[in-house]
């Protein structure tokens, strides 16, 4: 859900950025100085504190940010915001992105336009609620791994480039058996990421839906399918596989799953509260990021 919100200002601002990304330290430093000039309390996440001079500022571990801040500003690209979402969502801390990456579907504000933040801090912004997925890997009765994903839960080949055979169940109903290089289970947020390159549909972020996108399927009739986001997806790895595939959440963690194991995916119970400037427009973002503004040349 996207709504324009006018509410009391944000006064305690936590800053986060990814080390090793060009321009991030400089933007963090400029942002810190700008926030101080606006008489806001600035809190540095531990890694951000290593990148700039924050000797006079409070430094807080990532998992404790909500105790000290009412807004998290992330400097980086979409990958940086994905990482921040994994930290902010369980704490229900709103997130605003400053783009230092390439595409920037999720990070709205350019680093040379930090003054846009002033209106947001004064309570004038758009708040968008985006759901996440929760993935669970089980082998027998044992839970091997569990994690959340803003973009996608992905079944990938193992170390050998071989096809994977697996069964798909939705709400305990058998859907199909597939042989493919893998499967992407994507949220609307992730539909413009890895799933898009795999031929998946673009899902508007306000849709309560997720898409299952097969990767290089063995049969031409195998196509992406869009399902209700309230569904539970079960992927059963065929015992006939002679390799153990991997399961990844947002590309951040990779867990091996043995043949016969199951991957369960469902909507996570906490959403991401993503903050945008009041002039944010989703279709405008698509036009800019996907070069839809370019008109076809006339013959």
UniProtKB/Swiss-Prot annotation:
Gene3D superfamilies according to UniProt: Probable inorganic polyphosphate/atp-NAD kinase, domain 1, Probable inorganic polyphosphate/atp-NAD kinase, domain 2
One Pfam entry name: NAD_kinase_C
EC number: 2.7.1.23
Presence of keyword NAD: yes
Catalytic activity: NAD(+) + ATP = ADP + NADP(+) + H(+)
A Gene Ontology term for the protein's cellular component: cytoplasm
Cofactor: a divalent metal cation
Family: Belongs to the NAD kinase family.
Descriptive protein name: NAD kinase
């Amino acid at each position: 859900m996207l709504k324009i919100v006018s509410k009391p200002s944000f006064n305690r601002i936590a800053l986060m950025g990814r080390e090793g990304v060009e321009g991030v330290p400089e933007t963090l430093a400029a942002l810190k100085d700008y926030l101080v000039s606006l008489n806001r309390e600035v809190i540095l996440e531990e890694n951000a504190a290593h990148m700039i001079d924050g000797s006079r500022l409070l430094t807080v571990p990532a998992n404790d940010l909500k105790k000290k801040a009412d807004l998290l500003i992330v400097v980086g690209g979409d990958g940086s915001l994905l990482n921040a979402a994994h930290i902010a969502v369980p704490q229900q801390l709103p997130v605003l992105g400053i783009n230092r990456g390439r595409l920037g579907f999720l990070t709205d504000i350019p680093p040379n336009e930090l003054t846009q933040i002033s209106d947001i801090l004064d309570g004038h912004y758009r708040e968008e609620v985006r759901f996440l997925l929760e993935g669970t890997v089980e082998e027998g009765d044992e839970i091997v791994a569990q994690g959340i994903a803003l973009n996608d839960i992905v079944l990938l080949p193992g170390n050998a480039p071989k096809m994977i055979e697996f069964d798909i169940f939705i709400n305990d109903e058998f859907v199909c058996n597939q042989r493919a290089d893998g499967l992407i289970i994507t949220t609307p947020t992730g539909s413009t990421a890895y799933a898009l390159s795999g031929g998946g549909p673009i899902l508007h972020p306000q849709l309560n839906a997720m898409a299952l996108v097969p990767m290089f399927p063995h049969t031409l009739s195998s196509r992406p399918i869009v399902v209700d986001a309230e569904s539970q997806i079960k992927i059963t790895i065929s015992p006939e596989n002679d390799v153990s595939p991997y399961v990844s959440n947002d590309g951040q963690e990779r867990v091996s799953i043995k043949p016969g194991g199951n991957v369960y995916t469902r909507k996570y119970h906490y959403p991401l509260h993503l903050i945008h400037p009041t002039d944010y427009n989703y279709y405008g973002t698509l036009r800019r990021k996907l070069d839809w503004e370019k008109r076809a040349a006339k013959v």
